[in-house]
């Protein structure tokens, strides 16, 4: 059952919710942050990334979660995600890039779902998996227009390479809280 994670309160580990992402390549970090600032992004947002396992909450063991992610990450090699056929998902308040799901990122997602899914509750259905990069989230309509025009100048190349995944956790509610990286996991390193 889907819930609105916006106002979840911090758990016994000090975080309201968690997600697993592949951080954007370094060359995109600054341009993506520039877009967020220009569009007026105020809601807590993770810096440029592709979501690999969607938002979840109510975990029983942070150490158990870290161990499970480490194990899964070690079993998967770095991923190339093609930009051909990419869609722009736009709403009144958000701009999201949708990528075609390839077998490698789907397998990583599926393994995370199998191993991480039972350790907490998903805020929304993760399947079917939709590989995406949120550019701005819950901004004013003029912010959407700004972000939309700026992504036209963004050079994503033919593919994005991901060599790591991050466990991110939100400290506090969405408006006023902050996302923090709890740990980075190298893909293919057991």
Regions found by a protein language model. Name each.
Residues 1-80, 99-164, 176-190:
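Basic, often amphipathic N-terminal segments
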Residues 84-92, 131, 164-174:
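Short proline/glycine- and acidic-rich turn/helix-capping motifs at secondary-structure junctions
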Residues 92-99:
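Surface-exposed, active-site-proximal loop segments in enzymatic domains
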